[in-house]
Amino acid sequence: MATKTDFLAILQTMAGRDVDYIVVGGVAAVLQGAPVATFDLDLVHSREPENLNRLLAALDFLEARYRTLGAETARPTYSHLVSPGHQLLMTRWGPLDLLGTIGEAQGYSELLDRTVTLDAGQDLSVQVLDLSTLIQLKEQLANDKDRAILPILRRTLEEKGKGS
């Protein structure tokens, strides 16, 4: 579906529909200066009813479909998005992972006070999970991919601390 990955276009679509979300994962790390590569955009979204309706409108515009084998034509529904689970989607502008919760069942409301507002480009401000919380979550997950990136995230946090 996606011919070119454009995470900024996905974020602009969400902002244009007033979707409440927090950027987590690799894009959150990159926005905070970590020199890492990422292949998808991870968002923890608010599961409040009004927000889910706005999110569904954004996903419709993005032509979002599940990217799991055999489900490539399935679209996310309200009942999918209200769950605490992960929705692994492909959009017109690349892979998007929508997370009801992360870590130890932490959702949008629980994480909001652990975010920073950052400029994502083109006058778009986004809520991003702060680097220390991102590190804590990666330590909890403890899979090979997360363990590999931890030294880079810690070093970035250390460098940011020196610059403050």
Model-derived regions: residue spans:
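Compositionally biased terminal segments of proteins
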Residues: 1-164
